[in-house]
Amino acid sequence: MFRRLLIATVVGILAAFAVAGFRHAMLLLEWLFLNNDSGSLVNAATNLSPWRRLLTPALGGLAAGLLLMGWQKFTQQRPHAPTDYMEALQTDGQFDYAASLVKSLASLLVVTSGSAIGREGAMILLAALAASCFAQRFTPRQEWKLWIACGAAAGMAAAYRAPLAGSLFIAEVLFGTMMLASLGPVIISAVVALLVSNLINHSDALLYNVQLSVTVQARDYALIISTGVLAGLCGPLLLTLMNACHRGFVSLKLAPPWQLALGGVIVGLLSLFTPAVWGNGYSTVQSFLTAPPLLMIIAGIFLCKLCAVLASSGSGAPGGVFTPTLFIGLAIGMLYGRSLGLWFPDGEEITLLLGLTEMATLLAATTHAPIMSTLMICEMTGEYQLLPGLLIACVIASVISRTLHRDSIYRQHTAQHS
């Protein structure tokens, strides 16, 4: 047992450095090509001329597509092993390391050029790759899947500063394939990754700064639970839209570079209306949480961002869909809150409260992982007073969503991009 805990610690350290490496590479490319040192792609887009704002995502998608197509032609074969940590966990615990690194580099290109796709997917993949490399060198074969799970959880903890949610995500996704006793090393890796990441970044701040002054009462619990029903209906709709957009891009029968470039062009066009469509949505989420906008502003940004996410994901842009889903949930919740706020004196607090809860419930509806979704929002915002209501709402959202749409967003996304 001591040996496993020691290896889990090493995996956590490796994962933290893998995530930090990708984050710093992203910041470097943003500084070189966008003259942006703020770390916010929305700020970068705001400061660009309209023609550069239009073309940059398209050129990034084109470059990523050429890289992926060139690698496939160079090797003259498809990857001989998984290039995704979810696939590796469901098979024999092995990666195609070279193809996975190329995929991560392609993700770096589309992320830094403004595509509305999550950077955290590549971060978690690199963390799992680092864990796999170490495991294949120093551990027996039957443990490889465990250490990949530890690496993925550690990567999620370092990326989102949510070690418990990262650990439980792995446990919920792999329920039935991992014994409960295996959860110990996963948690150790996640916590170590968070601590090392805090040391690297010289900060232990929460991912999102939220000032929620309301004390949750009976009325608020009823509203929170209602967001679970809303998310249970919206989650399957979002998954259906993503699947339809992917099929639409595939039906065009374009070469991968042109398909990714087309997705980038759509993002670029949308960014002419609002630069908030650039990136994974992190900075827009923070701005909404700091000062919830008016109803029409939320609606406008939401529609543009939703179309950008659908275009990026549908075109096959390598990256995650976790953080974009958080923004979509926040926007839906705030639209709901603004509508209800017309009848309540504390409309601002209700808007913020329902925005936070819809982030969790839509995440639960799309991932089918309600416990992870609850803890994720609590850990990212520090609003643990929401925990009881969120647990109920997330379970409701997950149950309704599973009834309407069998596959989770990860299973669907993996199938589309494998």
Swiss-Prot record:
It is found in: Cell inner membrane. It is a multi-pass membrane protein. GO terms for cellular component: chloride channel complex; plasma membrane. The chain crosses the membrane at residues 5-25, 54-74, 146-166, 168-188, 222-242, 258-278, 291-311, 316-336, 352-372, 380-400. HAMAP family: CLC_ClcB (MF_01203). PANTHER family: CHLORIDE CHANNEL PROTEIN CLC-E (PTHR43427:SF6). Probably acts as an electrical shunt for an outwardly-directed proton pump that is linked to amino acid decarboxylation, as part of the extreme acid resistance (XAR) response. This is Voltage-gated ClC-type chloride channel ClcB.
